[in-house]
Amino acid sequence: MTSIHVQVPATTANIGAGFDCLGAALSLHNQFQFRLAGESEPFFSLELVGADVETQKLEATADNLLYRAFAKVFATLGQPVPHVNIAIDLKVPLSRGLGSSATAIVGGLVGANALAGSPLSQREIMNLAIEMEGHPDNVVPALLGGCQLSVKHQQDWVICPWVWHENVVPVVAIPDFELSTEEARAVLPQQYARAQAIFNASRLGLLPHGLAQNNPEYLTAALDDQIHQPYRKNLIKGYDPVQQAAIAAGAYGMVISGAGPTLLALAAPENAPKVATAMQTAWEGIGVKAIAHVLEIDQQGTVIL
């Protein structure tokens, strides 16, 4: 095998109270075509499919996250890293809180593993992905699909899939400005009050029942948080009016997707289009260009096409 085509979904992490441990895969995808190159060709070259402002930021260097993940597999196997050409079709925007880095990590690992003859198990790939990302909430659902809770137990990970009812519809509103994960983490406190821990524990306990049962009362109460969102919302211009617009249009609630600035609302199918329009309009009303999507939960995760 000299080429492989990999598709990886976007992800939304945290979903309110599940900070750094909960995430879900979304029906928005990046695709990566890996082709082994000859020794006379560059060690790494990029082809950008449908090149736009986002893809112009990517460079074919050894520091490229996609290439680092690709090389990680061969280093793990104790093999030389082959020269490779990678064509990227980018649909997940960069630095927006939709797991773009997770798509690169998982895509690079899965592509390299396939080209090496698939010696690594899915679990081994998952562990490498978590090691590279530093936390599991994006890479685990990006690899496995669905909604996944990741719990570190001793030296291993316990992965618990959550049922997500098909009538709980994710709506994402993506502004045209970026917010780095590093900046979003820098505003978080080092310590929290006991009441804040109890608040989040109760919401995280309620959330899976709301998602599985399509229970509006549970979802409305569960989509709240005191660990990260109160601190990060001030980094996102328009957070309050967008939230108010989403709720007024019928959303159960709204949360920051990952580190932001994308905002995620959950709604009933009949309300989801109205919620999307309301969120986008609210942002545009304060001078922020934005685009909103009514999506689904991607249950497949990463696939080889």
UniProtKB/Swiss-Prot annotation:
Primary residence: cytoplasm
Cross-referenced InterPro entries: GHMP_kinase_C_dom, GHMP_kinase_C_sf, GHMP_kinase_N_dom, GHMP_knse_ATP-bd_CS, Homoserine_kinase, Ribosomal_Su5_D2-typ_SF, Ribsml_uS5_D2-typ_fold_subgr
Pathway the protein takes part in: Amino-acid biosynthesis; L-threonine biosynthesis; L-threonine from L-aspartate: step 4/5
Gene Ontology MF terms in the entry: ATP binding; homoserine kinase activity
Catalytic activity annotation: L-homoserine + ATP = O-phospho-L-homoserine + ADP + H(+)
PROSITE patterns xref list: GHMP_KINASES_ATP
One GO CC term, this protein: cytoplasm
Gene3D superfamilies named in the record: 3.30.230.10, GHMP kinase, C-terminal domain
Broad enzyme group: transferase
Function recorded in the entry: Catalyzes the ATP-dependent phosphorylation of L-homoserine to L-homoserine phosphate.
Protein name from the UniProt record: Homoserine kinase
